[in-house]
């Protein structure tokens, strides 16, 4: 018997939430992406739409962005649970560190309700402040994963 955590792959970085970023534009594109991943042996997916860390400085803008993602994610979840009942679908964000000191206290920014957080930087350039920023995250109990 294969232990559950070794049974199939887990995708921790996907843009399958329809219409919220540069990934799937429609639910049909998301469905096609799910099929490809399932055929590749993926059993668990954490969806990670783009989220700008600077939004954490404005509660209204942050809630507006998360509500947009929530609506589209629920549509994806309903389709997935109906058509692919054996697939585990989880939520997260790919947090763009466009500011050096974001407030990452909101659990919705983390991967699948864990202490892991997927991060990236603007322009695919790692700024000089990266090591101190990541050290602060780790000291706060977070486990950053670099996209």
What role is predicted for each listed range?
Residues 1-82:
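An N-terminally biased module of ancient metal coordination in phosphate/nucleic-acid-related enzymes
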Residues 57-147:
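Extended substrate/RNA-proximal surfaces in nucleic-acid metabolism proteins
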